Amino acid sequence: ENYKAECRCCGNTRLECVVSLGNSPLANNLLNDENQEDELYPLQMNYCPKCHNVQLSHSVPREKMFNDYLYVSSTTEVFKTHFNDAARNLTRKFNLDENSFVVDIGSNDGIFLNPLKWKGVQVCGVEPAKNLAKLANDNGIPTVNGYFEDEETIEQIGIVVNGGHLIKQEADLVTAFNVFAHSDKLEQITRNVFKILKPEGQFVIEVQYLLDTLKDLTFDNIYHEHYNYWSVLSLSNFFKGLGLHITDVEHINTHGGSIRVFIGSQQLDVKPSVTEFLKSEKEFGLDKLETYKEFSRKVEKLKENSVSKIQSLKDEGKSIVGYGSPAKATTVLNYYGIDSDSIDYIIEDNEMKHGKLLPGVRIPIQGKNGQLDTNPPDNILVLAWNFFDYIKQNNEELVNRGCEFITLKD
């Protein structure tokens, strides 16, 4: 029922299946108890030979994933720093001041808008998860609870900012961090962005970078919330189709490699970075089917190696505890078939996840507690591998007691 036969970008119906990770539960829908059923959906990646977009074969209804969301950006110091830096960079680049108006799509708890508000910039967030929109509003960040592709959400943006008056203030900047992969209604979102932007305003997005995923084999970044896996090549084709232009691209380190892309309706001065990215993508082979088939073969090999490594640790009688329960943990553990027989429990810093179970593999999630001190495990498997160094440094006492910190990529 949820099968997507045509390309989300160009409508081409001749898509090629390049990676299949089997049936997997929704990555962030943690279970409250043992009796709760898992909802499984195919996790399969298709490549469009026409516009080179890489996308999931199935679309899970958005309400199942985003209405109540357990991922709070501000839980992680690394992300706080990232968004503070982003706010500083974009303030400088666009000369933002108290006369500027910035709208952030998928604003979570207001982590990016908060530093802008402190500088006096007028801000408004749009967040589909009720719990996060409430959190942001409680913290003084005006936030509309809704989906940006919906007309009624757009109508409310003016109201929130202008104290109940429907004076439409045009935005100088609209941002979307790690959102552009998360929607099946990209054309509608983009049209709405340019509806509320000033003519010379810019749309800035951050997305995980497909080239990094392929190069570093970070297949665990593939999950149902991410409908699309972007490159500058595929984004460029998508925006061109809407009469828009990419004016600049920057590489950033979040989520195992991402890109920050600047889009405008006028062909403002296009920076050399755009051509440079397109050139390196062509050299890597992002426009060739074989590149993706090769990725799939490497992922299968990685699975073989990782599963046998975990098995040999268990055969030696070693205990293993997981650290971090990001979405990628659901993907990798379900694909590998590593469950609570191998991993006793998962430690997690985000309190909203404590007492829940990782879906599919049903591994219990808990906070750092006495159990770690009284009975430290032989191995700590860092599932939030993009924070490996940060997690290891924060748990020096465990390292000193002989705990070995490992990842599934070692």
Locate predicted features.
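Conserved beta-strand signature within the Rossmann-like core of class I S-adenosyl-L-methionine
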Residues: 200-208, 404-407
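Flexible, glycine-/basic-rich loop-and-beta segments that form/coincide
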Residues: 255-299
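Conserved SAM-binding loop of SAM-dependent methyltransferases across substrates and taxa
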Residues: 109-120
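A conserved beta-strand element that flanks and buttresses the S-adenosyl-L-methionine
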Residues: 172-175
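Short, glycine-/aromatic-enriched active-site segment of Class I SAM-dependent methyltransferases
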Residues: 205-228, 232-234, 239
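N-terminal juxtadomain amphipathic helix
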Residues: 1-78, 250
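A short glycine-rich, Lys/Arg-flanked "PGG" loop and its adjoining helix->strand segment in the class I
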Residues: 187-202
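Conserved class I S-adenosyl-L-methionine
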Residues: 98-108, 320-323
